Structures are given as structure tokens and as C-alpha cells.
């Protein structure tokens, strides 16, 4: 009888272990490089010991390519920008609707939440919610370029050989706005948009002698700014915020036509297998102390109410040095990218690269 009891107990333990293994879950996260800091991942796994987080770092183009290749399989939570969801899903069927009742949306900034919902609603279903937001614009060393505030200043002969830019779609859009155009409105008229691109290409080719170098990564840009090789550049705001901590003369400058604003989101891949874990992660990073840790990692601002107050002190100082209330009101949010636009922009950029000798 004693042996029987021990055997039963042993079987029960094995069975319980099997159940535990069966209940274990993996959250496969497809995200940007700074959106899954090790400290937060560890903290999440400690709170939910039945969930293991696997992180794949990516960008907008790669996210679409990876999910397109698998039909939305291989990942449980993705973080595309708000303007890269609608067209990608309509074309490739890679996402599934979100259950907003599972998300603490009441802590989100209503303007950002409503904007993302509007951009990602398809057939009455919402496909994303906001995570963090930031901008692209200009950066200047105010001790050397105190009046720098227009996209066109990058090409001002006053700063010949002392400016930089990255040959990506942001500079095309910035130049378009500086020419008095609204490129986002022109998305609805591809002929009009091509005219705008042609003018931007001519302008940027003519600008090449003003450019010290075309930056490709944030580290390249930071080195040029800190060394004084350049006095201003087109940039992500997060790069400028980082440099502000090393030299308070280097500040992010919202262009006079408005900084270009993006919102990175949370979206569920169509064949994801861990929706509950995904919702837990979303709610976890919305908690105030985790918002601060995330912003410290990313340099971006959370899409929650009171986000400015939750920034680490150094980031808060950099943001306050960059933005006024009017600058915030003047933000130009990236619009949904319809099919065909990226191909047009890619060809425009190739023309500039060929003419300027940039790779």
C-alpha cells in the first residue's frame, strides 16, 4: 500500500509538472531596438513566471516583410508605426483586430489613441493602439547656428559644408513642406505627388555641396555634431535629446512647418498564438514606473496621459528645451501610406543618391 501511495504521488507530481509545462507560454515580440529593455523584460517575466519573452528587433519595412512571408505567423505582438498598418494589412492580411476591453486604454492620451484608432480601423475593427511617439525634424548647435529653424536652412550657403541629412523619406517630406506643399494630402493624387517628389529631388541634388556627409545611423550623426564637424542636421528627436545631455547647446529644433510626428503602436499578427500574453505586456508597459523605464531606453514619449511628467529628468529637460506648446500643436503626423507611394519615394531617393554619390 505504501509503495502504491508513493507511486501515485510520483505520477501526480509528473502530471502536475506536465500541466505546468503545458501552461507555459512564449510571447514572441517583434519590435524596435529600444522597446524591450532587458530590465523590463526580466521584471515582466518575474511577474508572470509562466510567460517567456522572445524579442526580435526590427523596423517598419522588416516587420511587414517578415509578417508577409508567413501570413502573419511567427510573432505574437508587433510594433509598427501607425502609418504602416492599414495598407499593409489590406494588401497582405497580416494582422488581426484587437480586443480593446483587454487593454487599459483609459490611461492613454485620448488624442493619440483616437488618432491611431482612426488610422487603423478596417471594416469597423481596430487593429492597433499607441505605444510611444516622437518626431523627426532638425537639430542645431545653437551656439553656432542660433537661427536655424527651417528645413531649407540645411541648404543655406551660410552653413555650407556644415550640415547633414539622411537620404530617407523624411527629408523628401520635409522639403515638400518647406516648398509650401502638403505631401500627405497629395497621397490621394499620385500625379501631384510625383510632381512634388520631382521638385524635391532637384532641390536636394542642388543642395549636395552644402552637406558635409549623409548620415546613416545615429552614432555617425552624433559624432559629427559633438566634434563640431557639422552645426546642424535633419534628425530623430531622440538623437538630439541624447546629445543635449552631453552638450546643452545641441537641441532638437521643430521645423517652422511642423515636426514630422510618428506613433509606434501595438498590433497583433494574424496568426499569433499568445494574445493574452500580448495584452499583459501592453498593460505592463503602460504602468507609470515602466513608462519611465521605457522612455529612458527609447528616448521617446509614451502615449499615456501625463507622459511628460514620467520622462527621466534628462529627457524631460531636452524635450522642454525643444518644444513649446505651439510646436506641439503644429505637429505633422505621418499619414497612412497608400500602395505605390513607397516605390515612388524609393525611386526619388535613388536619383538623389546617384547624383550625389551617396550609397
Predicted regions located by residue number:
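Periplasmic-binding protein-like
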Residues: 197-207, 245-270
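A ligand-binding cleft/hinge motif common to bilobed small-molecule-binding domains
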Residues: 83-87, 232-249
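Early extracytoplasmic/lumenal segment of secretory-pathway proteins
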Residues: 25-88
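Ligand-binding "clamshell"
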Residues: 89-97, 122-125, 242-254, 317
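Mature extracytoplasmic/periplasmic domains
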Residues: 260, 269-329
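Extracytoplasmic ligand-binding site segments that recognize negatively charged/polar headgroups
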Residues: 74, 82-85, 89-222
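Conserved C-terminal helix/tail region of periplasmic/extracytoplasmic solute-binding proteins
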Residues: 325-359
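A bilobed periplasmic-binding-protein/Venus flytrap-type ligand-binding module shared by bacterial periplasmic
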Residues: 137-144, 176-178, 263-274, 293-294
Amino acid at each position: 500500500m505504501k509503495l502504491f501511495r508513493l507511486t501515485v504521488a510520483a505520477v501526480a507530481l509528473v502530471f502536475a509538472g506536465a500541466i505546468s509545462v503545458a501552461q507555459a507560454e512564449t510571447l514572441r515580440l517583434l519590435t524596435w531596438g529600444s522597446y524591450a529593455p532587458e530590465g523590463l523584460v526580466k521584471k515582466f517575466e518575474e511577474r508572470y513566471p509562466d510567460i517567456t519573452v522572445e524579442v526580435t528587433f526590427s523596423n517598419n519595412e522588416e516587420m511587414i516583410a517578415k509578417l508577409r512571408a508567413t501570413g502573419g505567423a511567427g510573432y505574437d505582438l508587433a510594433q509598427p508605426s501607425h502609418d504602416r498598418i492599414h495598407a499593409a494589412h489590406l494588401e497582405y492580411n497580416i494582422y488581426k483586430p484587437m480586443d480593446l476591453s483587454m487593454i487599459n486604454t483609459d490611461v492613454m492620451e485620448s488624442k493619440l489613441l483616437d488618432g491611431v484608432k482612426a488610422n487603423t480601423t478596417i471594416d469597423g475593427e481596430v487593429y492597433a493602439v499607441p505605444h510611444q511617439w516622437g518626431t523627426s525634424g532638425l537639430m542645431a548647435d545653437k551656439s553656432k547656428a542660433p537661427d536655424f529653424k527651417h528645413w531649407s536652412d540645411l541648404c543655406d550657403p551660410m552653413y555650407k559644408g556644415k550640415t547633414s541629412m539622411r537620404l530617407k523619406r523624411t527629408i523628401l517630406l520635409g522639403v515638400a513642406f518647406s516648398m509650401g506643399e502638403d505631401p500627405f494630402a497629395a497621397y490621394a493624387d499620385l500625379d501631384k505627388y510625383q510632381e512634388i517628389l520631382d521638385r524635391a529631388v532637384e532641390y536636394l541634388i542642388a543642395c549636395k555641396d552644402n552637406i558635409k556627409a549623409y548620415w546613416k545611423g545615429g552614432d555617425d550623426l552624433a559624432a559629427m555634431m559633438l566634434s563640431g564637424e557639422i552645426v546642424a542636421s535633419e534628425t530623430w528627436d531622440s538623437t538630439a535629446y541624447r546629445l543635449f545631455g552631453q552638450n546643452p547647446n545641441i537641441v532638437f529644433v521643430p521645423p517652422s512647418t511642423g515636426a514630422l510626428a510618428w506613433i509606434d503602436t501595438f498590433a497583433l499578427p494574424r496568426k499569433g498564438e499568445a494574445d493574452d500574453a500580448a495584452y499583459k505586456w501592453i498593460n505592463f508597459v503602460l504602468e507609470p514606473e515602466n513608462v519611465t523605464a521605457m522612455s529612458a531606453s527609447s528616448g521617446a514619449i509614451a502615449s499615456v496621459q501625463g507622459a511628460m511628467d514620467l520622462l527621466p529628468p534628462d529627457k524631460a529637460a531636452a524635450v522642454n528645451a525643444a518644444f513649446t506648446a505651439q510646436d506641439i500643436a503644429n505637429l505633422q503626423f505621418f499619414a497612412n501610406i497608400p500602395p505605390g507611394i513607397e516605390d515612388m519615394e524609393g525611386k526619388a531617393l535613388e536619383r538623389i543618391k546617384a547624383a550625389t554619390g551617396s550609397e
